[in-house]
Amino acid sequence: MLSVEILHEEIEPIDENLQNLLVRCLEAAAKLEEVQGEVVVTLVNNERIHELNRDYRGVDRPTDVLSFAMNEPGEGEMEIFIDEDEASEFPNMLGDIIISVPKAHEQAEDYGHSFERELGFLTVHGFLHLLGYDHGTPEEEKEMFSRQEKVLEEIGLTR
């Protein structure tokens, strides 16, 4: 099972139907990847994601989505080992996904599809990053994007 929390930071909350769409996207992706755990999705404005992108990635501009995985140790962090017998007592916190709502609107218009489809795409994209997928090489990109499309097709978010 996947537990999802949706937060709004420095923006008006999106409506309940869109929030349910994000949950459906994440549940479909989790099912495809056979993973359980907890995910927090925070919806922000361009100024906030710009700040996070600059502070955490060293890129001084807004972006569409950022992912902060909890299951991969960062540089200089100590790895935590949990006894298998005790593992069920701890939730599998997969991480945080930060999405710029204004950027999603812009990109939906640029790509000629719905805002819902763009928001779903960014949600699944961020989720796959939490699981370690990347698109730094053509092979990685092909694998990641095919998984994204499979999830989006499954829930009816086609182009």
UniProtKB/Swiss-Prot annotation:
Keyword terms, alphabetized: Cytoplasm, Endonuclease, Hydrolase, Metal-binding, Nuclease, Ribosome biogenesis, rRNA processing, Zinc
Cofactor(s), by name: Zn(2+)
PROSITE patterns: UPF0054
EC number: 3.1.-.-
Localization annotation: Cytoplasm
Cofactor binding note: Binds 1 zinc ion.
Record has Nuclease as a keyword: yes
Binding-site list for Zn(2+): 125, 129, 135
GO BP terms: rRNA processing
Primary localisation category: cytoplasm
Family indicated by similarity: Belongs to the endoribonuclease YbeY family.
HAMAP family: Endoribonucl_YbeY (MF_00009)
Function: Single strand-specific metallo-endoribonuclease involved in late-stage 70S ribosome quality control and in maturation of the 3' terminus of the 16S rRNA.
Alphabetized NCBIfam families for the sequence: rRNA maturation RNase YbeY
The protein, known as: Endoribonuclease YbeY
Organism in which the protein naturally occurs: Brevibacillus brevis (strain 47 / JCM 6285 / NBRC 100599)
Gene responsible for this protein: ybeY
